[in-house]
């Protein structure tokens, strides 16, 4: 079994896309409109068929609580190597 997609909760998909693509160098894979949001994924340029990062809107109230709790406790939600 292999992980295909993993989510990164973002406040703004357009800003997150600019950061992950232009600053970190990830390559856009899918950009599919879905109402107010998009199914927006990127992959590593070193492994274009690897795990897709889904830039997932943090619109659900629980995601904001989750992110705030991790930040308050100093726990990183994502790590790249």
Model-derived segments and spans:
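Vicinal oxygen chelate
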Residues: 1-7, 27-81
């Amino acid at each position: 079994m292999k992980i295909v997609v993993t989510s990164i909760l973002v406040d703004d998909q357009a800003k997150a896309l600019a950061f992950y693509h232009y600053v970190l160098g990830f390559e856009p894979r899918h950009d599919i409109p879905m109402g107010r949001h998009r199914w927006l994924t990127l992959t590593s340029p070193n492994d274009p068929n690897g795990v897709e990062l889904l830039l997932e809107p943090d619109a659900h109230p629980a995601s904001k609580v989750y992110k705030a709790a991790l930040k308050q406790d100093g726990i990183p939600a994502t790590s790249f190597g």
